């Protein structure tokens, strides 16, 4: 009997999640006991609709394109799972002779992976989690695939914006980085600094409480000294009470969709300090950029 593999993507994609997918197919082809490698089309919900694609049916030339393709080639989701759902999965896995279930995602996906493992451990079905998140906040990992490319993007973007602001030093530019409650991406902007005075000039992380008055004082002092100022802020900034400095747009099961922190702070600078300011929010560009994909990140994702 063939032992098939099922790969499921969960949560937000990255610039290298497809490299992990390629790595799975590559390794499966080396093992004669493995039959097909299925991809769940559209994430976790595809398990219940049994919407699978046979990834081993593609030739090597096409599969290698995955290494340099952004986002998720098989689709992802934030499909909510409940206790009753996990038992249903076992029957579906058996129906398709799936002996290996590989879930590629962040914290929410790893949580689901644990639940699926519990219902499969006595059914001779192996469940494995493949780490993925630009936020770099998965427990017990030094760093996760996806973060390196996002870090490279924000560092390169900060360096370029810094040169722009330096050449016309008349305003404050506030750049907002993704990462939710983790400041790893925002902190990576410091890699743009090559010499004293280079951007970013100020960095604000969600690991510390944010004080608007102190922020305005910092900006005013630097702007008076050097003219142009580049500030990096995290989308997850919060005050001393733990409240987001900008109310979230909305919340779903596990995810919080933050408001425009950079726009809010730029408006504060204009209104309170009378200084020209603008906001930049790369957003999804920062996790989808293949142009700035890290080769190290890609190889680590492939091996993950």
Task: List where the protein language model places each region.
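Accessory alpha-helical/coil subdomains and C-terminal extensions
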Residues: 103-105, 111-115, 119-120, 124, ...
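Short, ordered loop/turn segments at secondary-structure junctions
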Residues: 10-12, 40-45, 78-79, 106-107, ...
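C-terminal active-site/capping subdomain that shapes the small-molecule cofactor and substrate pocket
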Residues: 269-304
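N-terminal phosphate-binding or glycine-rich loops at protein starts, especially the Walker A/P-loop
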Residues: 1-51
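Short glycine/serine/threonine-rich phosphate/pyrophosphate-binding segments
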Residues: 14-24, 47-48, 82-87, 106-115, ...
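Short glycine-rich or small-residue beta-strand-to-loop segments that form or flank ligand, phosphate
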Residues: 4-14, 72-76, 99-104, 172-177, ...
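Glycine-rich oxoanion-binding loops at beta->alpha junctions
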Residues: 47-99, 108-110, 134, 145-152, ...
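Gly-rich Lys/Arg/Thr-decorated short loops/hinges at beta-loop-alpha junctions or inter-strand turns
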Residues: 4-8, 65-76, 132-142, 167-171, ...
